[in-house]
Amino acid sequence: MKTWHIVPSSIAFIATAVCVIVLSLLPLPGYATQQGPFADLSGDWSGGGTVTLSSGSNEKIRCRATYDSQAAGNNLKLALRCASDSYNVDFRGTAINSGGNMTGNWFESTNQAAGEFFGSIKGNRIDARIEGQTFAAFFSMTTQGNRQSVSLRSPGSRVSSITMALTRR
């Protein structure tokens, strides 16, 4: 019968190897993949609200939105269609998050308008300024789970404000 002699340096080597293997299987908190602020927006949303025209009259509005989050939630493609009795909008845009600062471009096909937007993202709230050649507005959006509240203010334009509540479908 053969006897095995394990020397202390062999035990140390085996223990070190086991520790390395076990530690390599544990997640490292500092290196975990973090999702960007747009990650939870993906999907189809719909709802309604109110359009306030420059004349002071109010109209009910119905909207549908589609958000496509990309690049681990740091890029967003969006499409928004809204209609009221006298107002239609077909808005498309792309947004990029960089450390809580948002920039992007937009195009609205009904009025053939285009421009850019920039703003900030803090938690579940986005605040932005939207600009085009003939249009400027302040935009805010708060998302909580499957519900979203959206506000757009554009003093001096034909549509002075839009408020709406959307729900993920």
What is the predicted function of each stretch?
Residues 82-134:
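Contiguous, well-ordered beta-strand patches that form the walls/edges
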Residues 12-27:
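Bacterial N-terminal signal peptides
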Residues 30, 112-113, 138-169:
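Edge beta-strand at a domain terminus
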Residues 57-99:
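N-terminal glycine/threonine-rich, aromatic-flanked beta-hairpin/loop signature
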Residues 62-68, 91-95, 116-119, 137-143, ...:
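Hydrophobic/aromatic beta-strand elements that line small-molecule binding cavities or substrate pockets
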Residues 42-46, 71-79, 99-105, 121-129, ...:
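Short, hydrophobic/aromatic-rich segments at coil-to-beta transitions
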Residues 1-9:
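N-terminal secretory signal peptides that target proteins for export/translocation
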Residues 31-46, 71, 96, 140-143, ...:
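N-terminal helix-cap/turn-to-beta initiation motif at the start of protein domains
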